[in-house]
Amino acid sequence: MALKDKWQQDRIGRQQGVQERQQQVQTTLSLWQQERQNQALDDQESRQGFVTGVQQQTQELLTNISTERLWVAQQQREQLENFIQQLSQEVGEFLQQTIEERSQVAAQLHQQLSEFREDLEYRVTDLLANYQKQRLEARETLLEDLAIFRQTLYREVEEYLGELDILHQQMAAQLQQQLQQSRTERKDAVQKLFEDLGVFRAELQDYHLKLQQTVWGSSHRKPRKAITPQRSIPSRLYSC
């Protein structure tokens, strides 16, 4: 075989070897690209499944928190209504008892005044009878005794009326103090309830924000906090 033919044959063999290696490289690259595409699809499906699971768990957690918050609010509202009802009942019973005591005092006073008037009429009648009998004998002495009796009677009546006025003022002051104390205690209880609700709302918002940061990370835009207007305590709860 001539040298040229041999060189030509070797050249063709080298070209075929190069083509085979190029084909192998192309096949290997195609396989790698297909594997990378499949892996990317698998990773995308895994991420989508993870995000869907996290969203579902977050929604369930928020639903449970909302349900629990509504239940707690319902329980606290029932407790507050029971407290107000019990306090109103106690105040009504106290007022009824005070009215009955005042009625008893008035009845006793009326009876005492009636007895005093009867006794006074009797004493005046007896005094007038004695006065008519002893008029000529002891006019000056009788008039002096009558003046002393009148002064004593006036003083006793004034003292008795003063005692009644003091008793009435003491009862009114005691009733006012008890009503003021009940109103203050009820106000403190309602204020404490709303403060607890405010703390619970702040803790819930903080927990929700931390949960969003945990799920979405710090790269996502943080949601704006909902501004809840401060609720004022109804004045009707303080004025019973």
From Swiss-Prot:
Sequence repeats: 18-50, 51-83, 84-116, 117-149, 150-207
Signal peptide: none
Major site of localization recorded for this protein: other
GO cellular component term of the entry, any: gas vesicle
Residue ranges with Basic and acidic residues bias: 1-13
Compartments where found: Gas vesicle
Residue ranges, annotated region (5 X 33 AA tandem repeats): 18-207
Keyword Repeat: yes
Keywords: Gas vesicle, Repeat
Annotated GO biological process: gas vesicle organization
Region (Disordered) residue spans: 1-20
Cross-referenced InterPro entries: Gas-vesicle_GvpC
Family affiliation: Belongs to the gas vesicle GvpC family.
Function statement: Confers stability, involved in shaping gas vesicles, hollow, gas filled proteinaceous nanostructures. During planktonic growth they allow positioning of the organism at a favorable depth for light or nutrient acquisition.
Protein name in UniProt: Gas vesicle protein C
Species assigned in the record: Planktothrix agardhii
Lineage: Bacteria, Bacillati, Cyanobacteriota, Cyanophyceae, Oscillatoriophycideae
Protein's gene: gvpC
